């Protein structure tokens, strides 16, 4: 009698086209391990990512706006979930491997810093050799999670996590789906958040966006997703049509000009570099202040690497707690 995993693998042979990746044909893991009887290898990757500490910490990491007051702004976690849903929809329609797509999407931002891209820019300036969140995401799943053992994900998932950023050599079509879904998600939900914050008003976006993509968030996402599916249906690459590509590029340029570089939205970012550098430098000069796991990394790979790993994994709130603990005098009472 076959097990549930084998049944699912047989189903994939019917549901996944020749352009997709079959779980049964996976290149395997860094460390071989027995198969699960219930789940395919990519389904196990999904579960490992969702249950890891780095994934949970995304709920307290900035998406765009630093320390927003309000319950409905996106965080790095809600962004990740939106990317995963968009990517899975596209993958299903194109008969690619939905589970691999979802695993890549859920893991793609695990290495993101506190304070969003402002934090990434700060660590890129601080750490010798530079800091890139997609490389750190791979390091999280390979080296930092599970007390240094890593999650031991499938190679297809690992490569997809590394390759989710524009300009990085492609891996699978599933990885390409995540790469585009990431962009679809962030330009749309960041516009929604910018309107909520009063930085933009409804209708401020260029006319080409409203004409070709739609007015509401759901309309824009549906227009782009539908176009990607129709354009990519018979291709070995994931693309948008020329008309939608033009509109999305105008959309992206508009967001960079009016939101991502807006002095109101970015007014507090100048403080981020000083805070992160102060914490990082303190750990470099005082390795004994690092947790034991990171002191072990310092022994193997150097204190600068260990300090970067630790600081990049912090949430926005924890960074401030650490900063106050390290640098702000504590109140005391004379008895």
Language-model features: locations:
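Conserved short loop/turn motifs at secondary-structure junctions
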Residues: 106-107, 124-125, 296
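Alpha-helical ligand/cofactor-binding cores
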Residues: 106, 120, 138
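Histidine-centered, transition-metal-coordinating active-site segments
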Residues: 1-80, 84-90, 97-98, 130-335
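Short active-site segment of divalent metal-dependent hydrolases/proteases
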Residues: 111-115, 185
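Short alpha-helix carrying the canonical HExxH Zn2+-binding catalytic motif
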Residues: 102-107, 180-181
């Amino acid at each position: 009698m076959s097990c549930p995993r084998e049944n699912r693998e047989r189903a994939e042979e019917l549901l996944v086209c020749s352009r997709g990746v079959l779980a049964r044909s996976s290149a395997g893991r860094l460390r071989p391990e027995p198969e699960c009887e219930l789940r395919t290898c990519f389904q196990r990757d999904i579960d490992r990512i969702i249950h890891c500490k780095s994934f949970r910490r995304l709920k307290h990491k900035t998406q765009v706006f630093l320390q927003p007051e309000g319950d409905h702004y996106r965080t790095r976690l809600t962004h990740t979930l939106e990317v995963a849903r968009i990517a899975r929809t596209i993958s299903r329609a194109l008969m690619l491997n939905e589970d691999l797509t979802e695993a890549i999407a859920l893991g793609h931002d695990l290495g993101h810093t506190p304070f969003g891209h402002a934090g990434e820019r700060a660590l890129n300036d601080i750490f010798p050799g530079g800091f890139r969140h997609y490389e750190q995401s791979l390091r999280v799943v390979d080296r930092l999670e599970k007390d240094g053992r890593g999650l031991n994900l499938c190679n297809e998932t690992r490569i997809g996590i590394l390759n989710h950023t524009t300009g990085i050599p492609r891996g699978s079509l599933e990885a390409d789906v995540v790469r585009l879904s990431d962009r679809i998600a962030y330009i749309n939900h960041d516009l929604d958040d910018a309107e909520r914050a009063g930085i933009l008003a409804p209708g401020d976006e260029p006319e080409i966006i409203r004409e070709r993509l739609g007015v509401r968030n759901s309309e824009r996402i549906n227009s782009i997703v539908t176009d990607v599916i129709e354009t990519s249906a018979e291709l070995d690459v994931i693309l948008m049509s020329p008309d939608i590509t033009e509109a999305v590029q105008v959309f992206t340029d508009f967001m960079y000009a009016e939101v991502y570089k807006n002095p109101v939205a970015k007014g507090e970012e100048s403080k981020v570099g000083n805070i992160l550098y102060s914490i990082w430098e303190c750990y470099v000069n005082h390795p004994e202040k690092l947790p034991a796991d990171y002191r072990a990394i310092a022994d193997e790979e150097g204190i600068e690497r260990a300090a970067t790993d630790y600081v990049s994994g912090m949430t926005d709130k924890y960074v401030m707690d650490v900063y106050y603990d390290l640098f702000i005098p504590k109140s005391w009472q004379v008895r």
